[in-house]
């Protein structure tokens, strides 16, 4: 995702690549959280919404609404393609989603160092 974000304006193909990168990163984020919480004895995580809510409750993420917006955007990328929707999602990735992924990664790396 950083490769796309380092560029200025994206053409349509690059924008599609950015969105696909978001989809992959989103899936990786919630499944990593699921694994993290299962390692701590949590067993009631059945999807991304559960994982993000628990992460918010436990202080791993701070911007709960942004993560809920990610769920909506991820669903849109799976079920429809509309140029305006794609542009709006790409803007959200650049402006709010990517920084949240970076914060989550840093938080998990810190926790890993503290417990490892």
Please report, for each region that a protein language model flagged, where it lies by residue.
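Solvent-exposed interaction patches of small proteins and small membrane subunits
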Residues: 1-116
